[in-house]
């Protein structure tokens, strides 16, 4: 303890109010001794202040601690960087526990590291632990170490780091640039601004996690049909930790009183790939017996083969007078049928949500992606880029990476990198999206990639991104796409005073986005990830909707023309369409304008999904409630988009994800006092952000219902792409793309 300074009184005062488990080490002293430890740290480890302060944190290590993970921490400290690892640590009494440790440096304004903050989260019951190592070859459906870093550690680390920064007299957010290196899902600087870091979309793994049911998922394509996912409720019921469950067959729940005939029925159903509901006596880890109304349901792939088995457990045990005796079954037949129905409904919900997570079982899941140049589509008939690429393909047989020269990186998303590339020997530029095949398979994102590829191949619209070709190597996929000089609408928004646009400009962008969404719905697609980051600005200034990996592609649309008479789609008044005969539907001219004014094009997908996907601030209430959702989620997101473009923030954003969700579900819509917005615009937003999906504008007749709203009066829908955009990027501008361009590309806005 000699020579180790006591923690500053201000540090102790500030940190004492935090209930998290963490320590603070002094980076200016040899061996980085601990100068502060929270009460939570003492409680978790069993050590006292005299045994902790002045020592390095390595006293928590033991025989099972992985030296490779320890080396990651040492390397990060040496470089002054952040890192996040999962370590097997030991309490003072020798009890091992899994510790999700996140180390974050605190830097002074001159860039010198003064402190290291180490946040610990006991994830023993949540992590997969050694399941991967002990059951080699068992691919887990959800990688929990990554999920815990993103969903549990991130907010705790933010709380502690900001508190230490304040105590150190450092402007909050100074450490964040370094902290972004840690795999916590937080990218870019923290701050108080609504868009201080990119909003990462929630994926299909979140769907499974959020299903509030007692269930597990097994993979029949692997020997002995091992469990690859177990819900928290399943772990609570059985008393097992996730590490003890993953990679094992479900038979460990059987015991002395389990009926062998019932077990044989389950085995036969697995062999046949059929659905089954039975009542079986199971046992918890502690040996307590319980009646389990067990439903087994196959989740099939596109070929009809069972890709996963969902096992739903419903505890139907009556209160037993003696915990030592097996419970007696005394339910009536009607009660038993009701419980069985409950399990079957839950299994159906889970299977539906899982559809998007089933990666192809073929040896090469990427075989469906063609390497040839896409067919030339009508809206690109005169595109010089198509012509140049076709000539190269005819000359060399196929497109190769050698045909392109990398100019610079445009951005990095959740599943890949985007580079600006130039075709060798020409001035033609493209955006190349690169994905690591192995990472996509490891993270269960193959289905997402295939969905995006299929949608890009199918669409042809002036307000949607264009895919020219896909180049495959042994390790990577490269999507060669149309390059947009203006970058993201997100960048334009951030470059404006107070991060907001003029109402007439918002109307222009909203009308083009609405038209793009209408086209996607016409093809049976639900977009599901609308936000400024996914709206690109073409060199002409018009929008291009991009990123379709979270879209729902299993719906279908049967377009029909319906006579509306005197009652219109919006607000009970007849839609006011321009005199052009094609302006209402965006289609070709047929018949007189007078005739078409009395008809409406209905083209909404008959789609019903349960996946929990999208960006949290833009999620519709029905997505959060897991009640199943359809195309109306896109109209909710359109309302959020219009609100954000006008006010510079989203209406329901909270400090935490769960707070945001709570606001979306329960809080009323409130408009800021500034800037002044027209009554028609506020009315449109209110009607789009109706929490009852059945009453939401657009839920009855789709996009035309929204187009007929008074706020869009005067928009010539048929000639949108020929109108002058509010901002036209300079093609010679060096600030070529992505949100990294700042405001440099928007000087002429």
Swiss-Prot record:
Q: What does this protein do?
A: Protein kinase that acts as a blue light photoreceptor. Required for non-photochemical quenching (NPQ), a mechanism that converts and dissipates the harmful excess absorbed light energy into heat and protect the photosynthetic apparatus from photo-oxidative damage. Controls the energy-dependent chlorophyll fluorescence quenching (qE) activity of chlorophyll excited states by inducing the expression of the qE effector protein LHCSR3 in high light intensities.
Q: Which residues bind ATP?
A: 410-418, 433
Protein's membrane topology: Peripheral membrane protein
Cofactor detail note: Binds 2 FMN per subunit.
Q: Which top class of enzyme applies to this chain? A: transferase
Annotated region (Disordered) at 563-591, 729-749
Give the keywords, sorted. ATP-binding, Chromophore, Flavoprotein, FMN, Kinase, Membrane, Nucleotide-binding, Photoreceptor protein, Receptor, Sensory transduction, Serine/threonine-protein kinase, Transferase
Do you know which SUPFAM superfamilies this protein is assigned to? Protein kinase-like (PK-like), PYP-like sensor domain (PAS domain)
Instruction: Enumerate the spans annotated as PAC domain.
Output: 81-135, 274-328
Asked if the record carries the keyword Ubl conjugation, the reply is no
Kindly indicate where the leader peptide sits in this chain: none
Q: In which tissues is it expressed?
A: Expressed in gametes, pre-gametes and gametes generated by pre-gametes (at protein level).
What EC number(s) does its UniProt record assign? 2.7.11.1
Q: Mind telling me how this protein is modified after translation?
A: Autophosphorylated in response to blue light irradiation. 2 molecules of FMN bind covalently to cysteines after exposure to blue light and are reversed in the dark.
> Binding of FMN: at which residues?
56-61, 74, 89, 99, 120
What family does this belong to? Belongs to the protein kinase superfamily. AGC Ser/Thr protein kinase family.
Mutagenesis or variant effect for residue 250 to A: Small decrease of blue light-induced kinase activity
Q: What is this protein called?
A: Phototropin
Quote any Pfam family the record assigns: PAS_9
Catalytic activity line of the entry: L-seryl-[protein] + ATP = O-phospho-L-seryl-[protein] + ADP + H(+); L-threonyl-[protein] + ATP = O-phospho-L-threonyl-[protein] + ADP + H(+)
Q: Which residues form the active site?
A: 529 (proton acceptor)
Q: Does the keyword GTP-binding apply?
A: no
Domain PAS per the UniProt entry, residue ranges: 7-80, 200-273
Q: This protein's superkingdom?
A: Eukaryota
Bias-annotated ranges (Low complexity) = 734-749
From the Swiss-Prot or TrEMBL record, state where the protein is found.
Answer: Membrane
């Amino acid at each position: 303890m000699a020579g180790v300074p006591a923690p500053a009184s201000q540090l102790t005062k500030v940190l004492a109010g935090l209930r998290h488990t963490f320590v603070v080490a002094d980076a200016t002293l040899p061996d980085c001794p601990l100068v502060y430890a929270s009460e939570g740290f003492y409680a978790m480890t069993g050590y006292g202040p005299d045994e902790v302060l002045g020592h390095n944190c390595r006293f928590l290590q033991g025989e099972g601690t992985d030296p490779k993970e320890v080396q990651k921490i040492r390397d990060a400290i040496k470089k002054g960087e952040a890192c996040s690892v999962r370590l097997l640590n030991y309490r003072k009494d020798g009890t091992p526990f899994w510790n999700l440790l996140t180390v974050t440096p605190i830097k002074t304004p001159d860039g010198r590291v003064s402190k290291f903050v180490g946040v610990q989260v006991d994830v023993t019951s949540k992590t997969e632990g050694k399941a991967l190592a002990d059951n080699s070859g068992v691919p887990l459906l959800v990688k929990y170490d990554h999920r815990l870093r993103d969903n549990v550690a991130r907010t705790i680390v933010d709380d502690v780091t900001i508190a230490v920064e304040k105590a150190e007299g450092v402007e909050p957010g100074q450490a964040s640039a370094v902290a972004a290196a840690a795999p916590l899902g937080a990218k870019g600087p923290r701050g108080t601004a609504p868009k201080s870091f990119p909003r990462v979309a929630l994926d299909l793994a979140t769907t499974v996690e959020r299903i509030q049911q007692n269930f597990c998922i097994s993979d029949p394509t692997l020997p002995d049909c091992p469990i690859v996912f177990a819900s928290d409720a399943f772990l609570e019921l059985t008393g097992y930790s996730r590490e003890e469950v993953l990679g094992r067959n479900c038979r460990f729940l059987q015991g002395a009183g389990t009926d062998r005939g019932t077990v044989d029925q389950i085995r036969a159903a697995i062999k046949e790939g059929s659905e089954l509901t039975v009542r079986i006596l199971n046992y918890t880890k502690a040996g307590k017996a319980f009646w389990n109304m067990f439903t087994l349901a196959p989740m099939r792939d596109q070929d009809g083969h069972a890709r996963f088995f969902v096992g739903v457990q419903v505890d139907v045990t009556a209160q037993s007078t003696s915990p030592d005796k097996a419970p007696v079954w005394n339910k009536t037949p009607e009660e038993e049928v009701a419980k069985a129905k409950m399990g079957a409904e839950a299994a159906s919900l889970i299977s539906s949500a899982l559809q998007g997570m089933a990666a192809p079982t073929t040896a090469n899941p990427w075989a469906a992606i063609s390497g040839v140049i896409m067919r030339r589509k009508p809206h690109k008939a005169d595109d010089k880029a198509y012509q140049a690429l076709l000539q190269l393909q005819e000359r060399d047989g196929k497109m190769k990476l050698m045909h392109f020269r990398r100019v610079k990186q445009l951005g990095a998303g959740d599943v890949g990198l985007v580079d600006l590339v130039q075709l060798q020997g020409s001035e033609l530029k493209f955006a190349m999206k690169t994905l690591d095949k192995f990472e996509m398979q490891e993270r269960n994102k193959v289905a997402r990639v295939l969905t995006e590829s299929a949608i890009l191949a199918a669409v042809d619209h002036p307000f949607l991104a264009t895919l020219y070709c896909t180049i495959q190597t042994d390790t990577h996929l490269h999507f060669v796409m149309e390059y947009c000089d203006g970058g993201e609408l997100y960048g334009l928004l951030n470059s404006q005073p107070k991060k907001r646009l003029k109402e007439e400009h918002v109307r222009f962008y909203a009308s083009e986005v609405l038209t793009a969404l209408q086209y996607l719905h016409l093809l049976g697609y639900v977009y599901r990830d609308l936000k400024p980051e996914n709206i690109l600005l073409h060199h002409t200034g018009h929008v291009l909707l991009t990123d379709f990996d979270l879209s729902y592609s299993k719906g279908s649309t049967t377009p029909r023309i319906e006579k509306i008479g005197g009652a219109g789609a919006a607000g009970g008044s007849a839609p006011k369409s321009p005199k052009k005969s094609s302006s209402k539907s965006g289609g070709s001219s047929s018949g007189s304008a007078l005739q078409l004014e009395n008809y409406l094009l209905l083209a909404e997908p008959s789609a019903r999904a349960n996946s929990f996907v999208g960006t949290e601030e833009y999620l519709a209430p029905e997505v959060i409630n897991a009640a199943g959702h359809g195309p109306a989620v896109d109209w909710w997101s359109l309302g959020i988009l219009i609100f954000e473009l006008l006010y510079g923030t989203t209406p329901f954003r909270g400090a935490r994800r769960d707070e945001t969700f709570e606001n979306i579900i329960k809080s009323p819509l409130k408009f800021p006092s500034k800037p002044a917005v027209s009554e028609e615009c506020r009315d449109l937003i209110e009607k789009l952000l109706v929490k009852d999906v059945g009453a939401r504008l657009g839920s009855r007749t789709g996009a035309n219902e929204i187009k007929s709203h008074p706020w869009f009066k005067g928009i010539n829908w048929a000639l949108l792409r020929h109108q002058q955009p509010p901002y036209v990027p300079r093609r010679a501008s060096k600030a070529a793309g992505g949100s990294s361009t700042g405001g440099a590309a928007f000087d002429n806005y």
